[in-house]
Amino acid sequence: GTFTIHYDSRIFLDSESPAELFSAAQLLQQEIETQTGFRPAICRRHQPVGSHLIYLTASPELSREAYTLAVTPENITICGSLESGVLYGVQTLRQMIRQAGAVLPTVLISDKPAMENRGFYHDATRGRVPTLSYLKQLAATLSFYKINQLQLYIEHSYLFDDLTEMWRDDTPLTAEDILELDRYCKGLGIDLVPSLASFGHLYKLLCTKSYAHLCELEGSASAPFSFYDRQAHHTLDITNPESLSLAKHILSEYMQLFSSKYFNLCADETFDLGKGASRALAEEKGTTVIYTEFVTELA
């Protein structure tokens, strides 16, 4: 059998369902209008009656992010968990509508994620700095495929208050951009996780006049640019107390913009460690030890 979306089809929210379901209903409404030309009205009512209706309801009995999607010749019912379950049911229905249009095959789907964390890591540093509009499009696409975590990697591409030398020739993301993106992602069931370079390949930062002296390798700031050099060098000099203060400062400013309980320190690729200013310390303690000590201080 089939279910046909009519010009008089409506989307009903259970009167007991949380207000967040309205956003999922709007997402479905926009998809139906785009694919079929019909724009179903969204209603909220206890025990709606009629045919060719789409019901969205939340159930605390379903496991986290789980949902059921039932398509019958009369109606469509999506029942999901309180945490993104209804949203994921809507995303599946959107995918069906893109394939079948207004005439959908009858089906019963019971679905839940096999992996709790399904993340996408986005580099917002190398190449052009993405705009807020682009990042929202990316988040919408990720949610469509039920990705629930987006890590935004930053080096120089955020407008740190007192680091104008670092970003002045770029178009960095602002605090307002991040706050808006965080809010937008949350509405799509995505945890926006901050990811900030804090130890290695700090090319733009350690090439400034104010902070070049904190680079592990002397003279790195004046070396000709190359993509390899940008990645392989420009590690903080851990023997200088200013390095730890600087790293903590940028981490503190950036992490406060996010509602996520996670933070990615990105203290990787410190290829220069122990080869310049910290050579003597590395020979005394070992590179692994001095690396671990610095990262522990950061955390």
Show which residues each predicted segment covers.
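Substrate-binding cleft of carbohydrate-active enzyme catalytic domains
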Residues: M115-A299
